[in-house]
């Protein structure tokens, strides 16, 4: 389901186009408000942060009886699709002449509105290189380029691996982390002592994960690279996990059903390694990790992978704290129901999957209704979704 910004926000964007993220061609993406506008009084005298807070307070007051009982988690939307990232790979054409991103394109940096350029200019001045503050990198290609087609992202000698590249990527990723910090800080104040868990979600940008530059992750805001000549090996997700730890929040992530081999070899996809990296960071910082499936899949290979990932590895708590072995997930959400799932064969497979989740992962606290396995029905699955830590969603 796609829910656009309210009309009054879109109208404000006509008066202040820098309210939205902007790419190198000047195309503005109205999917969400730019993080650089967080504290700009551009919405009838109020800032976006003011309006986010007003919405949260209204939600809290409206559902105060359900908080801590029916409603136990507040997932804070921090960007496109509710994810803490830049809209570097827009799946919908947001301007008539704008390029339509397609997998496995590397995407584009989204830092060309006036507020972001002002922030970049200030950072460049502080770094002693005012010449770096005029714009983003000039050799990054377009939405659908591949890393080796660009000067910035190419495997060897790419300018991502330079003093300038390190500066720019550090600034770009830090601005994203700071936005997540602001959002969680505000949410924590609104919902303090209400019996709910806070959570944010990172995007599963797994394409080009297995190349040195991690190009698609960089444009999305995750400075996650292998070591180069100027750039050290970076864990681009640890800063986000630290923010979660600071605010007592859970980290939600996707790709739980994926194998690397599900994807074309030439895309250098690494969903398994990416998932492990983020789970390991959560384990080291003692941050609860919640997973979900990325795609609409009802096959046995996907079910087996979900169960394996949810169960974790071993039972050595010290190795869990070190991140060398992965603890069980705190929660799993099964997404993307459709009519296919409720066909007799597919639903029987799903019923068995839910039963295995109960028996093999410890994430289910309830049986499948009060019926025998042969009698389990769609109503019983609904009961599981409302009474357990495995969530079922659309």
Residue ranges, per PLM feature:
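Substrate-binding cleft of secreted/luminal carbohydrate-active enzymes
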Residues: 236-394
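Polysaccharide-binding and catalytic clefts of secreted carbohydrate-active enzymes
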Residues: 5-242, 249
């Amino acid at each position: 389901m796609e829910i656009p910004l309210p009309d009054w926000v879109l109208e404000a964007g006509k008066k202040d186009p820098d309210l939205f993220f902007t790419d190198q061609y000047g195309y503005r993406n109205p999917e969400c408000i730019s993080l650089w506008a967080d504290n700009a009084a551009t919405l009838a005298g109020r800032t976006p942060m003011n309006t986010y807070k007003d919405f949260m307070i209204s939600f809290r007051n409206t559902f105060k009886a359900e908080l801590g009982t029916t409603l136990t988690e507040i997932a804070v939307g921090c960007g496109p699709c509710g994810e803490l990232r830049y809209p570097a790979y827009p799946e919908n054409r947001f301007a008539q002449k704008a390029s339509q991103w397609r997998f496995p394109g590397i995407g584009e940096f989204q830092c060309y509105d006036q507020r972001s350029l002002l922030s970049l200019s200030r950072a460049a001045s502080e770094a002693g290189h005012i010449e770096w503050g005029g714009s983003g990198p000039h050799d990054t290609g377009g939405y659908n380029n591949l890393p080796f087609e660009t000067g910035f992202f190419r495997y060897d000698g790419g300018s991502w691996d330079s003093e300038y590249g390190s500066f720019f990527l550090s600034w770009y990723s830090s601005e994203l982390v700071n936005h997540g910090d602001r959002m969680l800080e505000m949410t924590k104040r609104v919902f303090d002592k209400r019996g709910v868990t806070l959570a944010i979600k990172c995007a599963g940008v797994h394409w080009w994960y297995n190349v040195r530059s991690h190009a698609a992750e960089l444009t999305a805001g995750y400075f996650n690279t292998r070591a180069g000549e100027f750039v050290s090996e970076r864990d681009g997700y640890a800063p986000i996990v630290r923010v979660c730890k600071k605010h007592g929040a859970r980290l939600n992530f996707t790709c739980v059903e994926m194998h690397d081999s599900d994807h074309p070899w030439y895309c250098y996809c690494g969903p398994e390694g990416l998932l492990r990296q983020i789970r390991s960071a959560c384990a080291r910082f003692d941050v609860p990790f919640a997973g979900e499936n990325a795609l609409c899949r009802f096959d046995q290979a996907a079910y087996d992978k979900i169960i394996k990932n949810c169960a974790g590895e071993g039972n050595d708590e010290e190795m869990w704290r070190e991140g060398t072995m992965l603890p069980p997930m705190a929660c799993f959400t099964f997404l993307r129901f459709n009519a296919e799932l409720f066909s007799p064969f597919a639903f029987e497979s799903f019923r068995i999957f839910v039963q295995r989740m109960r028996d093999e992962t410890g994430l289910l606290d309830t049986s499948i209704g009060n019926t025998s396995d042969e009698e389990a029905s769609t109503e019983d699955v609904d009961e599981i979704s409302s009474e357990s830590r495995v969530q079922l969603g659309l």
